């Protein structure tokens, strides 16, 4: 398998991350040293993608407590809880963020020690375990998804659910990397993904680095590409999946799903188990982040719309489960009926 660069890592006692806001123009490594700097990196999309956000948040907890002066476990847990609440306020939609924070807190709560130094090491150990497990999950998603795309010549993807959004390999792009390693190279059409252009800036960059042929299109060209028969599948990632199979992903995903249905093209969602939120019965319960209006009204620093108009800028939309052909996870491929099969597969039962 192609070995893509890791977007977030722990090296020589510090966090290293690619500043994704600067791609593709510059490849810049940043090193957040405080929880505030990590919060800023998450909020400003220097690190993005649900799995990568979870990893960053877990490492952010370590940055928050590594110099803790707590005298006992109770004091340490209080500091950890405060840091977790702070990091949770950075972005509200990606469930992996909250999952990772909760996992680290639970590991500390279960620790049979009152030694603060040992608890600090436990926080770091758990954060790095989340990172390593995510990479393994992405590999597994690649294996499961490859069988679904084996007969395709080209696929369309939206936003970036590749190596830059995870520990490595990605979710939606993992099957593409897996097939390439086997000698089958798919062509990829990448939506530019307005307003922040993650498809143009990130997906095309990493696929081009991998030697995989990629064609950039504007978001409003997807229907034409499908109508001409140029793609045989659509594959996207997810930021949150509810118990019934509704999928929150980057704004514009819902429209792509509708187009795929109209053109008889399978619409696949690739995501790890940590992206599922079984506490929510449907997509209408997912909080949707709304971002700075300037992201829509400006192109960089240049205004592209008149001042004083209304601007709507949700970061995500929700694709109803009925448009989803299958959900690819590290545990296997989930097909309808989703409410029943999601519960079974996540519990480790056969489909």
Curated annotation (Swiss-Prot):
GO terms for biological process: L-methionine salvage from methylthioadenosine; pentose catabolic process. It catalyses: 5-deoxy-alpha-D-ribose 1-phosphate = 5-deoxy-D-ribulose 1-phosphate. The record marks 159 as: Transition state stabilizer. Pfam families: IF-2B. InterPro entries: Deoxyribose1P_isomerase_DrdI (IPR043679), IF-2B-related (IPR000649), IF-M1Pi (IPR005251), IF_2B-like_C (IPR042529), Initiation_fac_2B_a/b/d (IPR011559), M1Pi_N (IPR027363), NagB/RpiA_transferase-like (IPR037171). It is an enzyme of class 5 (isomerase). Disulfide bonds: none annotated. Keywords: Carbohydrate metabolism, Isomerase. Its EC number is 5.3.1.-. Substrate binds at residues 48-50, 91, 198, 249-250. Pathway: Carbohydrate degradation. The active site is at residue 239. GO terms for molecular function: S-methyl-5-thioribose-1-phosphate isomerase activity. Catalyzes the isomerization of 5-deoxy-alpha-D-ribose 1-phosphate to 5-deoxy-D-ribulose 1-phosphate, as part of a 5-deoxyribose salvage pathway that recycles this toxic radical SAM enzyme by-product to mainstream metabolites. Belongs to the EIF-2B alpha/beta/delta subunits family. DrdI subfamily. This is 5-deoxyribose 1-phosphate isomerase.
């Amino acid at each position: 398998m192609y070995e893509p660069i890791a977007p977030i890592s722990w090296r020589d006692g510090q966090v290293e991350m690619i500043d994704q806001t600067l791609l593709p123009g510059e490849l810049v490594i940043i090193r957040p040293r405080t929880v505030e700097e990590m919060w800023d990196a998450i909020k400003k999309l220097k690190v993005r993608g649900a799995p990568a956000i979870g990893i960053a948040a877990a490492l952010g907890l370590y940055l928050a407590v590594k110099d803790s002066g707590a005298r006992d476990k109770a004091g340490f847990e209080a500091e950890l809880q405060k840091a977790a609440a702070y990091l949770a306020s950075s972005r509200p939609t990606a469930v992996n963020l909250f999952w990772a924070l909760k996992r680290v807190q639970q590991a500390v709560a279960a620790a049979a020690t009152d030694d603060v130094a040992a608890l600090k090491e436990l926080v770091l150990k758990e954060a790095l375990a989340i990172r390593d497990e995510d990479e393994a999950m992405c590999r597994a998603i690649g294996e499961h998804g490859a069988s679904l795309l084996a007969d395709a010549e080209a696929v369309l993807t939206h936003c970036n659910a590749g190596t830059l959004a995870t520990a490595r390999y990605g979710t939606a792009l993992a099957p593409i990397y897996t097939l390439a390693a086997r000698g089958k190279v798919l062509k990829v059409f990448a939506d530019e993904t307005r307003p922040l252009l993650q498809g143009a800036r990130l997906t095309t960059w990493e696929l081009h680095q991998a030697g995989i042929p990629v064609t950039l299109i504007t978001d409003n060209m997807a229907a034409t590409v499908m109508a001409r028969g140029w793609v045989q599948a659509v594959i996207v990632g997810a930021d949150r999946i509810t118990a019934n199979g509704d999928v929150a992903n980057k704004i514009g995903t819902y429209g792509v799903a509708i187009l795929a249905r109209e053109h008889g093209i399978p619409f696949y969602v690739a995501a790890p188990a940590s992206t599922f939120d079984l506490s929510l019965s449907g997509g209408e319960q997912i909080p949707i982040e709304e971002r700075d209006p300037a992201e829509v009204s400006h192109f960089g620093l240049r205004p592209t719309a008149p001042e004083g108009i209304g601007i709507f800028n949700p970061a995500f939309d929700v694709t109803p489960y009925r448009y989803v052909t299958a959900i690819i996870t590290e545990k296997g491929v989930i097909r309808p009926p989703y409410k029943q099969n999601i519960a079974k597969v996540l519990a480790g039962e056969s489909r």
